[in-house]
Each structure stands twice: as C-alpha cells, then as structure tokens.
Amino acid sequence: MDDRGFVRWLQGLEAQGHEIVIHGYFHERPRRDGEKVGEKFLTRFYTEDEGEFYDLDYDEAFRRITLARDEFAKAGITPRGFVAPAWLLGSAAERAAAAAEMEYTTRLTGVRDLRFGDNFHARTLTYSVRNGWRRTASLAWNGVLARHLAGALLARVSIHPPDLNHLEIWRQILRLTDRLVEDRMATTYRDWIAERRTRRGV
C-alpha cells in the first residue's frame, strides 16, 4: 500500500476499535466469452463486474487473499475477516480464505465462521443506487426487511460510499440504524464471532 496517508487513516481506525477486513484485491472480475445467462446476471446485472471471487480457483484466490493479508501486516494492520466483493464467494475461494487464516466471511444472507464452519443466518440491509429504479426498490425492500429483522439476533447494515450521495438513502440508513440499536449493542464481526465461540465452549 503506497498511499501513506490512507495507511495512517486505517491504522488510526483500527486503534480506535474499528475492524479492518480484506474486501477482495482488485474488486473486479473481467468478462469472459461463453458465460452462461446466470453468470452474466450475477456478475454484470447484480453487480458491475465486481464478482472478483465468484469463480476464482483455489490457488489464485489464496494468492490474492494472502497478498492482501501480508500487505496489511507490513502496515501493522491485522485483518481477521474476508468479505468478497458483492458477497460473491465461490466454494474454492472460501476454502482459500480459511487456509489464509481468515476467521470469518460474510454473504448477503449471513456470517460464516471459517475456522469451525458454523453459519449464522443474518440478512443484511444493503442498497443498490446505480439508477433511480434501484434506489426506489432498495428503499422499499429495506423498509420491509428492517421490520422483519426486528427480533433477529444479529442485524447488519452494509453501507457503501455511493450511498452517501443520495439523501433519501442516507436518511433511511440513519433512521433504520437508530431503530436497530435501540435494543442491540454495536459490535464487530471479529468480536461477535468470538462471542459465539465462547458460548459453544471453544
């Protein structure tokens, strides 16, 4: 990581208790000839060519994750989790993340303890803001989903930088987050996974 200002910012966040995770390496997946309709839907429509770890083989996934891990380590930062871009994580890449000593990963629908293989269902609130109809659909869907998650053990809200460019999205994020923390305590994935392990006696 060549941007020293960025590195210092991350170091400061970690020192304050924030958790730094590996979120891909390039954050993109080149398009390929002969892709099936389902592959095109997930990698081009659902995301904008962001499914970097969607179908990477084990060796390449391991190389990228360990490369990112080691770059963080040189900066004195210790990421414990791996979250694939767009949560598109193939089975080979998941095994690679575990082999690279990542403690957990997340998907759209939950959290997985990579050390012990436990899955925790926890659908995340997230937004698609690329155009008007996506923003409208996101606002409606997340309003309903937040009510459904009212009694869930773990509530997750995934915020991306472009979300802040749309006032109606940002207002809903703040409103729903305020509601969710009324009877919950904010935590990191690292600490939440550690608590789950303690409860099961490991």
Where do the model's predicted regions map?
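A conserved mid-domain beta-alpha-beta active-site/ligand-binding segment of alpha/beta enzyme cores
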Residues: 118-168
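Catalytic domains of cell-wall/extracellular-matrix polysaccharide-remodeling enzymes
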Residues: 53-125, 165, 170
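Acidic-and-aromatic substrate-binding clefts and catalytic sites of carbohydrate-active enzymes
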Residues: 1-6, 28-30, 83-92, 130-138, ...
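Short, solvent-exposed beta-strand-terminating loops
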Residues: 18-38
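Hydrophobic faces of well-ordered beta-strands that scaffold small-molecule active sites
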Residues: 20-23, 79-82, 104-107, 155-158, ...
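C-terminal domain-boundary segment and adjacent tail
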Residues: 104, 159-202
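Active-site gating loops and adjacent loop-to-helix segments of metal-dependent hydrolytic enzymes
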Residues: 34-58
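Active-site beta->alpha N-cap acidic-glycine motif
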Residues: 1-21, 74, 170
